[in-house]
Amino acid sequence: MKRVHVAAAVIRGSDGRVLIARRPEDKHQGGLWEFPGGKVEDDEPVRAALARELEEELGIRVERARPLIQVRHDYADKHVLLDVWEVDGFSGEAHGVEGQPLAWVEPRELADYEFPAANAPIVQAARLPAHYLITPDGLEPGELISGVRKAVEAGIRLIQLRAPNMFSPEYRDLAIDIQGLCAGKAQLMLKGPLEWLGDFPAAGWHLTSAQLRKYASAGRPFPEGRLLAASCHDAEELALAASMGVEFVTLSPVQPTESHPGEPALGWDKAAELIAGFNQPVYLLGGVGPQQAEQAWEHGAQGVAGIRAFWPGGL
């Protein structure tokens, strides 16, 4: 089967909006929207191909870019690798050099545009931040509320309310308060009974690996349009998550952790290998913090997740 390597860009303006282009009607999947880019030539570095394509298509010069996600997609006649980079620094004013219509879109509104099927993971990656905060165990509700408030004020945009030692009624009350803090500012992910779905319409759900295995055979236990995530530790769990149609996962442990001493860590190379076989955004977890975000990007991850390293004031 023919193999095609494509470099594509999630171009982010200073206001946070993302640039998309509409495909010509006479091309394959014409009329659909896409992320700008083009084919990587033989022996051409991906970043160089990206810079060349964006200058040819949009008249801009790339000044700052980093890996975002790789998506593999099989068509009837070819296998395509979409090598997607986030570009948040460029010079020049973007315009359709070839006459193609362009649009600057708020990330949350990307889902309202029609893209080729292979672009769905890119849309999701463009909407997700690089950091994922998981709340720590053993804190009182007031301490958790205060910490989440500080985290949101500091710019954290994705938060998992994890409180395994709380009884359900206490967790539910806390989730109501935390949802209010996050409204319009951060995406809240809950870890509670799925029967609560209707009571938290703005929240996503993060499945434990045990829940993932429990629900996998029945399919996605969650409405489309709301974020579903899962905790994964190996290739089998990643395959289950993919079959369920999750929007993102955490993959752990990357490195040894204080919370699980003695548990074997994946290591960076194994994590990269697992990510390469998974087409959705992945947050690396376990022994990592904000300072490892760049290393995570280089290994194919969306970013990093953590508890201690992200909690305001530390633990």
Language-model segments: what does each one mean?
Residues M1-V18, Q70:
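Conserved N-terminal beta-strand and adjoining loop/helix that marks the start
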Residues R17-E57, L68-Q70, Q187:
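Conserved Nudix-box catalytic region and its N-terminal flanking loop in Nudix hydrolases
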Residues V71-E93:
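Active-site-adjacent beta-strand/loop module that shapes the phosphate/pyrophosphate-binding cleft
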Residues V84-E86, A94-R127:
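NUDIX/MutT-family hydrolases
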Residues L128-E143, L227-C232:
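Active-site mouth loops of central-metabolism enzymes
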Residues L133, A151, I159, L197, ...:
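Conserved, mostly hydrophobic/aromatic
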Residues R172-G192, S217-D234, E263-G289:
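Alpha-helix-loop-beta-strand connector modules within alpha/beta enzyme cores
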Residues S209-A218, F248-G262, G287-L315:
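Glycine-rich phosphate-binding active-site loops on the catalytic face of alpha/beta enzymes
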